[in-house]
Amino acid sequence: MEDQIEQAVDIAIQGVGDPAVRQQALDFCNQVKASDEGWQMCLAMFAGDRKRSDAARYFSLQVIDEALGRLNREQLVYVRDHLFAYVRMGSGLSQGQANVNVGQAVSFADDPVHMKNKLGETLAYLFIMTYTEIWDTFFYDFERLLESPENQFGNPRAADLYLRVLNDIHREIGDTLIIRDPAVQSRNNDLKDLIRNRDMARLADSWKKILMYYKDQQLEPLATEIVNNALRVIGGWVSWAELTLIAEPEALEAIFNLLSSPKSRIHACDCLSEIVAKKMYPNAKFQLIQSLNLTSIIHTLSQSADIEFDERVAKLANSIGSELIHIVETESQEFSANCEALLLDMFPLLLRYLGNEYDDTSSQVLPSVGSYLQLVRRDSKREKAKINPNRLTKNTADQYENFPADRTFISDQRHAVVRSILEAVMKKCRYLDDQEWEEDEDGEFCELRQRLKNLQDMCASIDNQLFLDDVCPVISQALSLPPTADWRDIELGMFELQTLSEAMRSGALSTVKTGQNESPATQAFNNLFFQMVASDAVAQCPQPAVHLLFMEIVVKHSSLFSQHNTNLLNRVLEFFVSPLGIQNSESTKVQMRSWILFHKFCKSVKPQIGQVAQLLVDSIRPLLVIQTEDDTDSDDESAGSAFNAQLNLFELSGILVSILDEASATNGVEQTLQPIFTAVEKAIGVSPPNAESITLVHHNLVAIGTFAHGLDGSSNKLPDGILQLFKNSAEVVNVALDRIPDTKVREAARTVFTRLVPILGSSILSEISTLIQILLQRCSHAELADFLGFLGHLLHSFRNDEGVYNMLKSLLSPLCQRVFASLEELSASADAGNTDDKVLKVEIQRAYLMFIMQILRDRMGGAIVEDKQLADSIIKSVIHYASDPTDIYTCRSAASCLTKMIQLWGNGELEAASAEESVFDQGQKIDGFEQIVLEFSGLCWQVPASSGFNLQDAQSKILVTELGNIQKHIYLKKGDQFLSYLVEQYFPQIGVPDNAAKDYVEKLKTLENKDFKKYFSAFVNELVK
């Protein structure tokens, strides 16, 4: 059987071969894992006479691992005896038990690392299952294996395995980074307590002695691995072991000496980091750091040629710094002063690492630097809170304008450190001389910069003036550089200007005015902003990163432009339309982003653009040609992003055209739309339509709508010539829609008409009617919800237009038939298990109810009740959804529809919601509705009482208040007739006590709607208990 298992495992892991055979092998392996005897076969295979393949042995241990949790005591003892006998023989000793037979194992040193680790992992799992009651001599038995004639720990095979097992035990029960179930965590805590009581002293002694012995065994092949694993064990177990058992002078000296060993110094450094991070009282932690003399040791290790080691030393320095800062935060002033003095000695080292050219090393010290700034800021705020506000003066914005300077609340030492941090951070924010710009905002350096910017913000919030004094000169000097200067210096200045801007927006820098004067930060920024606009270094720098920052900053602060600085405004506009902006051919990212930013900028400064609008329109026009070739060369997401960015230019073109005089505007619209018409005509001529032609039609139609949206903001009435061109657009859309029956084209058509309606109004009712007929015939189930939303939007836009009302009357019956048919098909599919159709069904139900509600709100309910058969179908459907709380949102929407119907039709004829309003066909009789209004009351009680209804759920509570709304509106329409119905007929049926019934009808009569809904909720809660 063992041979079959080995063969199956070897076949299963092969990357080649017959897939069917591999699947059979996998199935066989899974059967072995699941079987009750599988672990025994695998134990025999692993520890048997014959050396199996590594894959088979690894699989055997996996099967044993999974089985351990379900084995009884006798079986666990069996596994222990055989595995430990195997370990003894692998360590070069006899198997130790006459009744246990295992094969002649080879040295563990011959195994690959992954096999050693797997054996250690399995023994750790076995420890967890047996240490409490079965194998309490676990550690003692392993330590006996370590002995050799030369030394108590001189068996390298056993020492290597022993340390791997200890590392795995810590990982399973002591590693706090792993989130575990409460039951598992409780078991782990119990195991740790047992270890502390039984074995911890001996364990700690063994680690130290192993470390001391093997660090000098230069000729032993396993020596380095054993030393490094011993350091890992000490670093891991120290978090939950008694520190005095580990931090003995002899052991610490050995660890310190290993800092100079190229093969072990990284592990030694990590070990010290864990020792420093051990939780203990602040006083004890301070004494530990002092006794270890770590600050001096760190200084001797700094700036190594070994990059990875340098990073670990930085991590250690960060650990020490963070611990010292925590002590300063929590201890008394006298004690924390001594601690802060030690911390200040470390800061030159922390800042040196902060400025390291390797970002991974630099990142290591950011937490401690950030913690120090938080400490200073907290203490500064505490001191500021002591200021008596009665002695201060407030400005018109209710802000204190003569508050003492930030510098007043910071000691000289701390002020100097904050300044040195700020300077180091700014230097680190600069791209290195051999580093290129990262276009990806998620790039490593960009992420690091964001963290550094957060540190700058903290510096700013600590001392505004310090920040301005240090940052502003860097910005000004960069903006004053010649265009031929290193782009990295210019880019740094721009980055810092953006940081200054964001610090003002976030409140890190105060913008409080003093009298009529702007704040120092505002004044400084405004000066630097206009220096940037006028800077040749920025305008002529060839680096796209600089161009992008420039455009981002001017868009955020476009409000600084006015009629008094149009020359600077024109300079910015010129920049945007140059090859550095929207015409950029060097960077696709910058070009697409510039299209978005140019749109935002012009929209903001539209009143100041004036005469240059025509030049801007002409500059944009070449970029309005829609291409689809790139869609096949890149993924759909990037192609879609390019088109979405281009749409900004279409809307911007509309905005700019609206500024022009009538003749120029008409000409501008024609020059924009005519190429689109031509492109659509060409695309719909492709037979049969292909993916490219469909995409081209879609994009061009959406472009029409987006361009129209830009013109929609015009305060003046558009010329007749422009209106006719857009009317032509509506006709083009319908032609394209008729010729290409595709989802994307239908979606684009809805978009275009949504944008044309505000411009053309009722003049395109004929085209809208044609559009709706085509969409109704062709839209799929998936489009139906969007189609209903589109119709609802149209109704609202033309809510006062009788022509649209008449169109709705002719449309509503076939539309509802289509909705009901789709829902019936989807229900059948959903019942058969199609989850997608189940979701789609719910979406259509909700869209349908929203559409009905829109009809009622827009006073067009006459379209529903004109046809009694249609009215009955709609009312029944609404009652059905309102009676089914399995989907709370749908149920609530239906309940709202019923409330509206009762409000408008409750007296048996079409009425307005108030005396100030009117409805179409007001006064029209509604046969039968008045008689069924009282019956609506029943669902108000049936829904909360239905099975599974949770009255404590937030959405359910909202639904119940809507049901109360129905009750109130029935009463408002039916008065005493409804009260009599409740008291004499309905309440007796459902068992409401007489006194409760009387109280209910009294509250229904007297309470306002808002108060009654609260009462109704409480009443229902009591009723369904």
Swiss-Prot record:
Q: Which InterPro entries match?
A: ARM-like, ARM-type_fold, Exportin-1/Importin-b-like, Exportin-T_C, XPOT
Instruction: Give the GO terms filed under biological process for this record.
Output: tRNA processing; tRNA re-export from nucleus
Entry's Gene Ontology cellular component terms? cytoplasm; nuclear matrix; nuclear pore
Q: Where does this one sit in the cell?
A: Nucleus; Cytoplasm
Residues in coiled coil: none
GO molecular-function terms, A-Z: small GTPase binding; tRNA binding
Q: Does the keyword RNA-binding apply?
A: yes
Could you tell me the keywords of this UniProt record?
Answer: Cytoplasm, Nucleus, RNA-binding, Transport, tRNA processing, tRNA-binding
Role summary: tRNA nucleus export receptor which facilitates tRNA translocation across the nuclear pore complex. Involved in pre-tRNA splicing, probably by affecting the interaction of pre-tRNA with splicing endonuclease.
Which family does the similarity line name? Belongs to the exportin family.
User: This protein is called what?
Assistant: Exportin-T
This chain's source organism reads Yarrowia lipolytica (strain CLIB 122 / E 150)
